[in-house]
């Protein structure tokens, strides 16, 4: 929005030309989103408390979690507000890629909101009926994916970048739609499963979004894309603004979500953030890199799949409890230790992911 205003005002003062630079707008988007999150946080928490929107806790979970019962949830609302306002202010809204990410972000946020609401109303952790939850997640993802495919179905926009391989970038064609669907829905649910401890999901999200800000900038820059041997996607550069808005909103939320948490993001936050990360990965053609950098999310999701599969097939559990962060808690690890260890692992994986862009 401010891009349009600056384009008009630059005729009166060339200083407004600074708004045309992605780097400037990226920094401002981060600061704006973080400022909004810090500003509205106390009021959002107060209103959630008044509405009695408190977290429900599994009875079979770690005993240390029982004290979390009643902590305000659905704090992801403040994340969505911060990202939305910051993006609308600083992104070039003529860019269709920005709207694809916002569509998934708020669409998944709406599904998460309903899921959280039913958990609170029923006073259990069941939430929205699973088949309806996945139905709406699938509908939103497919609408976005078909839109992305229609807008950019040239060679670069549907290539699959394989880490560590410079020249091997297979053309997916129609299979782009299938892969993209699973990336968006899968990432959304993986982040959702990770969101079980104070700050456990938001910090890895911040780290991965920061990395994607760099990748989006390189992907949207012809010279850097050629240098790194990655597909050049002209519209991708504007996604830097969205990535830094996610980082800023995440930092603002972390202020209130760090141990011991004053508020939880709920499904309204985790589903939407995961969906946004998945969509960004699809748009910059780095789906496989997301698997590396978001390794913590992947392991959390796999632990649940393996646990459920093992119990159904053998009536035996692999872990003491899934997702895997609860396994470590039941082994006696203090919650802060589990959280920080997962943060460190994510930092390592993000750095490895960035290095793969050059080591090919």
Swiss-Prot record:
The chain crosses the membrane at residues 21-41, 73-93, 98-118, 132-152, 168-188, 199-219, 236-256, 263-283, 288-308, 338-358. Pfam families: Glycos_transf_4, MraY_sig1. Pathway: Cell wall biogenesis; peptidoglycan biosynthesis. InterPro entries: Glycosyl_transferase_4 (IPR000715), PNAcMuramoyl-5peptid_Trfase (IPR003524), PNAcMuramoyl-5peptid_Trfase_CS (IPR018480). The keyword Iron-sulfur does not apply. Its main location: membrane. It is a multi-pass membrane protein. GO terms for molecular function: metal ion binding; phospho-N-acetylmuramoyl-pentapeptide-transferase activity; UDP-N-acetylmuramoyl-L-alanyl-D-glutamyl-meso-2,6-diaminopimelyl-D-alanyl-D-alanine:undecaprenyl-phosphate transferase activity. Its cofactor is Mg(2+). Keywords: Cell cycle, Cell division, Cell inner membrane, Cell membrane, Cell shape, Cell wall biogenesis/degradation, Magnesium, Membrane, Metal-binding, Peptidoglycan synthesis, Transferase, Transmembrane, Transmembrane helix. It is an enzyme of class 2 (transferase). It catalyses: UDP-N-acetyl-alpha-D-muramoyl-L-alanyl-gamma-D-glutamyl-meso-2,6-diaminopimeloyl-D-alanyl-D-alanine + di-trans,octa-cis-undecaprenyl phosphate = di-trans,octa-cis-undecaprenyl diphospho-N-acetyl-alpha-D-muramoyl-L-alanyl-D-glutamyl-meso-2,6-diaminopimeloyl-D-alanyl-D-alanine + UMP. It comes from the Bacteria. GO terms for cellular component: plasma membrane. Its EC number is 2.7.8.13. GO terms for biological process: cell division; cell wall organization; peptidoglycan biosynthetic process; regulation of cell shape. It is found in: Cell inner membrane. NCBIfam families: mraY. Catalyzes the initial step of the lipid cycle reactions in the biosynthesis of the cell wall peptidoglycan: transfers peptidoglycan precursor phospho-MurNAc-pentapeptide from UDP-MurNAc-pentapeptide onto the lipid carrier undecaprenyl phosphate, yielding undecaprenyl-pyrophosphoryl-MurNAc-pentapeptide, known as lipid I. Belongs to the glycosyltransferase 4 family. MraY subfamily. This is Phospho-N-acetylmuramoyl-pentapeptide-transferase. It comes from Actinobacillus pleuropneumoniae serotype 7 (strain AP76). The gene is mraY.
């Amino acid at each position: 929005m401010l891009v349009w205003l600056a384009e008009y005002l630059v005729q009166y003062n060339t200083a407004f030309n600074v708004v045309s630079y992605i780097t400037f707008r990226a920094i401002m988007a981060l600061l704006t989103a973080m400022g909004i999150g810090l500003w509205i946080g106390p009021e959002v928490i107060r209103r959630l408390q008044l509405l009695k929107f408190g977290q429900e806790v599994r009875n079979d979970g770690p005993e240390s979690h029982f004290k979390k019962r009643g902590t305000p949830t659905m704090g992801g609302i403040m994340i969505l507000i911060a990202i939305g306002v910051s993006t609308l202010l600083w992104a070039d809204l003529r860019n269709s890629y920005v709207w694809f990410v916002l569509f998934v972000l708020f669409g998944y946020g709406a599904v998460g909101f309903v899921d959280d609401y039913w958990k609170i109303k029923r006073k259990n952790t069941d939430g929205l009926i699973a088949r309806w939850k996945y139905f709406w997640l699938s509908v939103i993802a497919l609408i976005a994916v078909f839109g992305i495919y229609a807008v950019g179905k040239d060679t670069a926009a549907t290539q699959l970048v394989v880490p560590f391989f410079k020249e091997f970038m297979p053309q997916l064609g129609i299979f782009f739609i299938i892969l993209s669907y699973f990336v968006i829905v899968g990432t959304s649910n993986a982040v959702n499963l990770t969101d079980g401890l104070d700050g456990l999901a938001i910090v890895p999200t911040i780290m991965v979004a920061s990395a994607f800000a760099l990748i989006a900038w390189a992907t949207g820059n012809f010279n850097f894309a050629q240098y790194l041997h990655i597909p050049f996607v002209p519209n991708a550069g504007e996604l830097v603004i969205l990535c830094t808005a996610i980082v800023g909103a995440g930092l603002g939320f972390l202020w209130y979500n760090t141990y011991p948490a004053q508020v939880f993001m709920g499904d309204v936050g985790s589903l939407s953030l995961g969906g946004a990360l998945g969509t960004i990965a699809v748009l910059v053609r780095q789906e496989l890199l997301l698997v590396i950098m978001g390794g913590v999310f992947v392991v959390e999701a796999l632990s649940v799949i393996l646990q459920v599969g093992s119990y159904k097939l053998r009536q035996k559990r692999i872990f003491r409890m899934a997702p895997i962060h609860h396994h470590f808690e039941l082994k006696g690890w203090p919650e802060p230790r589990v959280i920080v260890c997962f943060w460190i692992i994510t930092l390592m994986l993000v750095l490895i992911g960035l290095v793969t862009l050059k080591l090919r």
